């Protein structure tokens, strides 16, 4: 993976009640990732950007929701989420206040 691609794979951390619970119980961190990203690319990007050891990566594809404004029907973009399990002692600080 080239240097630019690792910055395009991880789009944002997913911060929710479920992701916080999974983080505390299983040392897993949740990210919104590019739809065309593979598990190998996600693993490589997390290891290089955060300098941690990744044990496993699980991904989920989500279809965009259909939204309506008056008579007009539109659709939100589909997206992909990755659950990244880190080795014991490894952690990621999102920098959230």
From Swiss-Prot:
GO cellular component: ribonucleoprotein complex; ribosome
Alphabetical keyword list: Ribonucleoprotein, Ribosomal protein, RNA-binding, rRNA-binding
GO molecular function: rRNA binding; structural constituent of ribosome
Top-rank lineage group of the source organism: Bacteria
One Pfam family from the record: Ribosomal_L23
Disulfide bonds: none
One GO BP: translation
Keyword Transmembrane helix: no
InterPro entries, per the entry: Nucleotide-bd_a/b_plait_sf (IPR012677), Ribosomal_uL23-like (IPR013025), Ribosomal_uL23/eL15/eS24_sf (IPR012678)
Role noted for this protein: One of the early assembly proteins it binds 23S rRNA. One of the proteins that surrounds the polypeptide exit tunnel on the outside of the ribosome. Forms the main docking site for trigger factor binding to the ribosome.
NCBIfam families (UniProt xref): PRK05738.1-3 (NF004359), PRK05738.2-4 (NF004363), PRK05738.3-2 (NF004366)
Family affiliation: Belongs to the universal ribosomal protein uL23 family.
Assembly and interaction partners: Part of the 50S ribosomal subunit. Contacts protein L29, and trigger factor when it is bound to the ribosome.
Annotated protein name in UniProt: Large ribosomal subunit protein uL23
Lineage of the organism: Bacteria, Pseudomonadati, Pseudomonadota, Acidithiobacillia, Acidithiobacillales
